[in-house]
Amino acid sequence: MEFKVIAEYFDKLEKISSRLQLTALLADLLSKSDKTIIDKVVYIIQGKLWPDFLGYPELGIGEKFLIKAISIATNTDENSVENLYKTIGDLGEVARRLKSKQQSTGILGFLGTTSKESLTVDEVYSTLSKVALTTGEGSRDLKIRLLAGLLKKADPLEAKFLVRFVEGRLRVGIGDATVLDAMAIAFGGGQSASEIIERAYNLRADLGNIAKIIVEKGIEALKTLKPQVGIPIRPMLAERLSNPEEILKKMGGNAIVDYKYDGERAQIHKKEDKIFIFSRRLENITSQYPDVVDYVSKYIEGKEFIIEGEIVAIDPESGEMRPFQELMHRKRKSDIYEAIKEYPVNVFLFDLMYYEDVDYTTKPLEARRKLLESIVKPNDYVKIAHHIQANNVEDLKSFFYRAISEGGEGVMVKAIGKDAIYQAGARGWLWIKLKRDYQSEMADTVDLVVVGGFYGKGKRGGKISSLLMAAYNPKTDSFESVCKVASGFSDEQLDELQKKLMEIKRDVKHPRVNSKMEPDIWVEPVYVAEIIGSEITISPLHTCCQDVVEKDAGLSIRFPRFIRWRDDKSPEDATTTDEILEMYNKQPKKKIESPAVDESV
């Protein structure tokens, strides 16, 4: 299969703003792709060489070295490449222009032909894999030579998307939900297959693997798919409520209540002597927690399992729980074993999804928890999450206050009974979180996606000082604007913000973004931030839940304030539009709706 086919589709996809058209065009590409390499095609569409959970290196070529590779491939002076980049602001477009110029002035162009050996998807994939995996002395020069070799063979359009792929900025607006829908159309005969494919993806979060199973064994093979150790399951998510009485009522008056820890959610896989740890975002974080690997090996019985829990920082002297931020030191420190001594952790387990070749996601919580409790040996490091079974509001409240006093964020209330299965990848009422009140009218913080930025005035002039934030709508796989946040940032965070946003800046609005408000710059929906506000109000300026509460108006957060970045969350893990609506409906209503803040000033 020629790489040119993918490049031509990417070129079309980049110009489309309708998700329906995007999905249809992507389905067309998948149906025309070589079935023997369909997994590689899917990964390339996702903008990666392999799933994040494998923990393999990324391409690791910076802007400076890309410029050098383009310079070598197009026989152009490096300064000229750099100057053109400063003018255009897109290295992919720089490569396209220089290749076009080279093509028209070269001997083949002079003879009226551009015939050359075609660049194949296999060649692109294998070469870029070498680029990513090459390490050691002289590796940087080898990476540049390998990439320059690809760019030399590429035509202008191929060069454009090769460079963008290496940069991690394909800019074609494709999310996983869009790929799932396109796969249903291309391989399953239509949207009716979406549920089957989505279920399989929730159990094995590897779209390339799912596509390969479909083309080799058919859509029916997905119906019997089980979790596989080494491929993360998409985590089950909770709804939120701030009223204990209402929560217990939702649960039918009886529930298991766990501490909600202020740590890092972790999915732990074991097969024989191999242990993997995956984050909430399904990234391989095993290298950050060699101590946890050791604890699991020693204290959890079983040859093959997938369990879930929270890794929590512990004060080495008092044994008390420390906040989530303490775990960040593990990512920053070069000496992980020194970090283990300074920032020790405990693991609090709360679920079991797979054990000794049996899929437990379809079994009720009580059965899962009973087995989990039976396989944990007595020890000081890996424990079952603190929990009670509550059948009255007083017990729920008392346990909630105890969780808060011991450093937790609140509690997770979980349904029991035969229908209380593990809903992989779904947010539902089987789990409800009750978090502490932040002494504002909003009962909880929200996690929102940055989709744009605004330049400041006065001492902040010329710098991005406020952000356009959006909630995620899983039904349309889009991000709907909900507020403009300007407070809560330190000077250091504002300085860091400039660099963050300039790296993901776009010329036009991303096709997955739905916003009436026009920021000074648009950005890729990549970063997630935790936001608090005074209340949720009706706003004609924002598109979150547009026309749901009031015609021609959406919902907005009044007086929003930045709390922290949520690097542990992907954009699709952000607070959903339905959750924003639920929070709005749960607010104490005033006789007259609070006026929306005029965020245009």
From Swiss-Prot:
GO molecular function, one term: DNA binding
GO biological process: cell division; DNA biosynthetic process; DNA recombination; DNA repair; lagging strand elongation
Binding site for ATP: 258, 265, 280, 310, 350, 427, 433
Description of activity control: Ligase activity stimulated by PCNA heterotrimer.
Names of the cofactor(s): a divalent metal cation
PROSITE patterns on file: DNA_LIGASE_A1 (PS00697), DNA_LIGASE_A2 (PS00333), DNA_LIGASE_A3 (PS50160)
Enzyme Commission designation: 6.5.1.1
CDD domains reported for this sequence: Adenylation_DNA_ligase_Arch_LigB, OBF_DNA_ligase_I
Alphabetically ordered keywords of this record: ATP-binding, Cell cycle, Cell division, DNA damage, DNA recombination, DNA repair, DNA replication, Ligase, Magnesium, Metal-binding, Nucleotide-binding
Matching Gene3D superfamilies: DNA ligase, ATP-dependent, N-terminal domain, DNA ligase/mRNA capping enzyme, Nucleic acid-binding proteins
Catalytic activity as recorded in UniProt: ATP + (deoxyribonucleotide)n-3'-hydroxyl + 5'-phospho-(deoxyribonucleotide)m = (deoxyribonucleotide)n+m + AMP + diphosphate
Active site annotation, chain numbering: 260 (n6-amp-lysine intermediate)
Role this protein plays: DNA ligase that seals nicks in double-stranded DNA during DNA replication, DNA recombination and DNA repair. Interaction with PCNA enhances ligase activity. DNA polymerase I, DNA ligase and the flap endonuclease may be constitutively associated with the PCNA heterotrimer forming a scanning complex able to couple DNA synthesis and Okazaki fragment maturation.
Family to which this protein belongs: Belongs to the ATP-dependent DNA ligase family.
Record note on quaternary structure: Interacts with the PCNA heterotrimer, probably via subunit PCNA3.
PANTHER family: DNA LIGASE 1 (PTHR45674:SF4), DNA LIGASE 1/3 FAMILY MEMBER (PTHR45674)
HAMAP family: DNA_ligase
The protein, known as: DNA ligase
Species the sequence originates in: Saccharolobus solfataricus (strain ATCC 35092 / DSM 1617 / JCM 11322 / P2)
